[in-house]
């Protein structure tokens, strides 16, 4: 059996959330008892908690919702590239060493340990010119082990607007702590949330061959 790497953080009331966004909450609506045969809970959360796929609707009014996105970009060969010392922005030179025969999907590890239990504004993001460069190589999906491909303080979301213009899909909040650089199969399908600006994904990598 081919090896799998689960690159999704756990989702719970401890999950970090962008300041002002909706945290994870769960309450039990029904509970097992002599009168009730099942447990059923109600969950409220932002679709940007945990590993998730942003939809164009997140950064453009009237654009495509998460559940209406084609699934092909979220499934197939991908490359994991380490850029652990990149600083606040991932630049093309941080990835150029791994650019030969680039597959259509690229995930970048920027942190020694992904922040799965705490929020921090101090994370790495993609420089817009890096996304332009990746698009020129035929990349259709980018991913990162931080909450956003733009800096936390950005009000213009320049990198998000590049992926909108270039029709590139994006995965955020991945956990790549135990994944070595190299090529894998990515499986990270968004849910069919046909009105949503993003969707949780259960992102996994599978060895090739």
UniProtKB/Swiss-Prot annotation:
Cofactor (UniProt): Zn(2+)
Family from the record: Belongs to the Cyclase 1 superfamily. KynB family.
Protein name, per record: Kynurenine formamidase
One Pfam entry name: Cyclase
Gene of this entry: kynB
Transmembrane segments: none
Keyword hit for Hydrolase: yes
Quaternary data: Homodimer.
Gene Ontology molecular function, alphabetical: arylformamidase activity; formamidase activity; zinc ion binding
Cofactor note: Binds 2 zinc ions per subunit.
InterPro entries named in the record: KFase/CYL, KFase_sf, Kynurenine_formamidase_bac
Organism expressing this protein natively: Bordetella avium (strain 197N)
One GO BP annotation of this record: anthranilate metabolic process
SUPFAM superfamilies listed in its UniProt record: Putative cyclase (SSF102198)
């Amino acid at each position: 059996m081919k090896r799998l790497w689960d690159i999704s953080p756990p989702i719970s009331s401890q999950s970090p959330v962008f300041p002002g966004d909706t945290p994870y909450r769960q309450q039990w609506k029904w509970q097992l008892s002599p009168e009730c045969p099942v447990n059923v809970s109600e969950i409220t959360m932002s679709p940007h908690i945990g590993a998730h796929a942003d939809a164009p609707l997140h950064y453009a009014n009237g654009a495509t919702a998460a559940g209406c996105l084609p699934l092909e970009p979220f499934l197939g060969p991908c490359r994991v590239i380490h850029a652990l010392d990149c600083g606040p922005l991932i630049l093309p030179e941080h990835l150029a060493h791994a650019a030969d025969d680039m597959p259509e999907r690229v995930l970048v590890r920027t942190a020694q340990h992904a922040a799965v239990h705490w929020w921090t504004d101090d994370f790495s993001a993609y420089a817009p010119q890096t996304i332009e460069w990746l698009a020129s190589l035929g990349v259709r999906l980018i991913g990162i082990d931080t909450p956003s491909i733009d800096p936390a303080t950005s009000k213009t979301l320049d990198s998000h607007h590049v992926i909108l213009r270039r029709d590139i899909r994006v995965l955020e909040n991945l956990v790549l702590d135990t994944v070595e650089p190299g090529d894998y199969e990515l499986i990270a399908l968004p849910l069919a949330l046909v009105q949503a600006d993003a969707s949780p994904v259960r992102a996994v990598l599978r060895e090739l061959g």
